[in-house]
Regions:
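Signal that preferentially marks extracellular ectodomain short beta-strand elements
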Residues: 1-28
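Short beta-strand elements
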Residues: 44-61
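Ser/Thr/Gly/Pro-rich, low-complexity flexible regions
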Residues: 56-200
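A broad, low-specificity signal marking well-ordered, structured residues that form hydrophobic/aromatic
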Residues: 36, 50, 97
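Internal, hydrophobic beta-strand segments that form the core of beta-sheet-rich folds
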Residues: 25-44
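Short structured motifs
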Residues: 20-21, 47-49, 158
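Short, exposed coil/turn segments at beta-strand boundaries within extracellular/luminal domains
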Residues: 41-48, 186-188
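Solvent-exposed residues in well-ordered beta-strands and their adjoining turns
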Residues: 4, 39-41, 180
Length: 200
């Protein structure tokens, strides 16, 4: 299914006013939630149970394949842990991104990162709503703030960077982060992943 911006705004009002005629006047992070309906030959309308989200994004928003990964649990490499094949990265604003669903290999999570003008990746201490960043409900760690908790995965110049692909658009996000469990099996969980943008 394909559409243009004009299709999305046709007949749509927001607070009684039409949306801008050009998408450049929208804010990064603005979105539509599309609900699909089909009409039978008898005229019955049936709605699909699933929806699709269309958002105003930036270059690095999109669907990524996981092309490399490494996970260490309390100093022990865990190559047996399955990672997802793909991850969704959403734009929050011009420099902030949200990874939907996964924190490394673990689902039912989300986290935020930022890309600066030098294509370096950092992880803000707080989410856009002001809550502390967590992974699996534990404090998030990163190379800048918790280097001693990330000794088995790359930090420094070899990680937390963007590799731009100006020819094919298959940009890569090279990321190192983790979380620290305080109670129970306490200790660092360390993640390294390389995500490559999927281009149609």
């Amino acid at each position: 299914y394909s559409f243009k911006y004009e299709d999305l705004i046709n007949g749509l009002l927001l607070d009684g006013a039409s949306l801008p005629t050009v998408d450049s006047e929208l804010n990064i992070g603005d979105f539509w939630t599309l609900r699909f309906a089909s009409t039978t030959s008898q005229g019955n309308v049936n709605f699909n149970a699933r929806t699709a989200k269309v958002s105003v994004g930036t270059r690095f928003a999109g669907l990524y394949s996981v092309i490399e990964h490494d996970y260490w649990r309390i100093g022990v490499q865990r190559s047996d842990v399955e990672w997802p094949d793909e991850m969704v990265v959403e734009s929050v604003d011009a420099i902030t991104y949200r990874v939907v669903e996964y924190f490394g290999a673990f689902d039912n999570n989300e986290y935020y990162f930022q890309i600066d003008s030098n294509d370096r990746i950092t992880y803000p201490a707080l989410t856009p709503s002001g809550d502390p960043q967590v992974g699996n409900n534990e404090p998030m760690t990163n190379c800048d703030s918790n280097l001693t908790d990330l000794t088995n995965v790359p930090c420094g110049d070899l990680s937390n960077l963007v590799i731009r692909d100006e020819v094919n658009g298959k940009d890569q996000l090279v990321m190192t982060f983790g979380y620290y469990t305080v109670e129970g099996a306490s200790g660092a969980r360390e993640f390294y992943q390389v995500l490559e943008k999927i281009v149609d």
